[in-house]
């Protein structure tokens, strides 16, 4: 598939979820906001030096999403200990915090990692973030590097991988309001509207903001729902605080950012404005769309011939599971 739109659309329809063992659920307190949920799976035989990997999902997804489960499956097969986060308000975390799913929750993710590092005896982490989760990961790494006193890490990060991160959140919201890309706005708004109604059935804070809810665009949704619930005075303030584009030059751990030149949601040109640190590698692909990367296996591949394969899921798992990342980052 050579069209970024086709890659993105088909990925939205082709959702094979990997079957994983029942996870252990960690309920992590996040102060006055309640708790976040982290879902842990371990391989059948866990080595003492097995890498611990955190996975962060994108907007409208959760720990149970297609790429989250498929990447986790690949990591487990490679002997890794896997932790899939539900960002605040996403998936089952909607039951434990009134916060909305949002792209400025990097400090809450840091708190979760600190807690897990202490309770589980984990000294070092590898992490991957997909789409909005990728921006959250980059922002967390950068803010720690800028101000380790305010944003302390009680752990080391051996390696980070960010896929299709909306590093300029305002620009990405404006981008999906142009032309045919409005279809993506309709897709996200449909999911967000459904989530909002579910949240309002649980939390009075949601019932209050929904009185003035505006669902016409993602920006209007963020202005009337996300920003006030997340503690920001406006969508612009939320985007400014959450976007990682101005902080990327400060990241001091080995980091790969994977983007596609034909991503219809996160435009590649925003990365031309970014300044990257010496430890960051930007990888540009062609025709992958927004976290798509689908291709058909040749008919000659036996029973699998002609089937779609999700290239990125396996590639991300293989990259995160590489040996000796700790030595490379030291």
Predicted regions and their residues:
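Alpha/beta-hydrolase-fold enzymes
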Residues: 122-229
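N-terminal cap/lid segment of alpha/beta-hydrolase-fold proteins
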Residues: 4-45, 302
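Catalytic histidine-centered segment of alpha/beta-hydrolase-like enzymes
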Residues: 288-310
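Catalytic nucleophile-loop/oxyanion-hole region of alpha/beta-hydrolase
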Residues: 74, 88-126
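Short beta-strand/loop motif that positions the catalytic acidic residue
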Residues: 251, 257-259, 263
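Active-site nucleophile elbow and catalytic-triad environment of alpha/beta-hydrolase enzymes
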Residues: 224-247, 253
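Conserved alpha/beta-hydrolase
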Residues: 61-64, 72-96
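Short beta-strand element of the alpha/beta-hydrolase
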Residues: 49-58
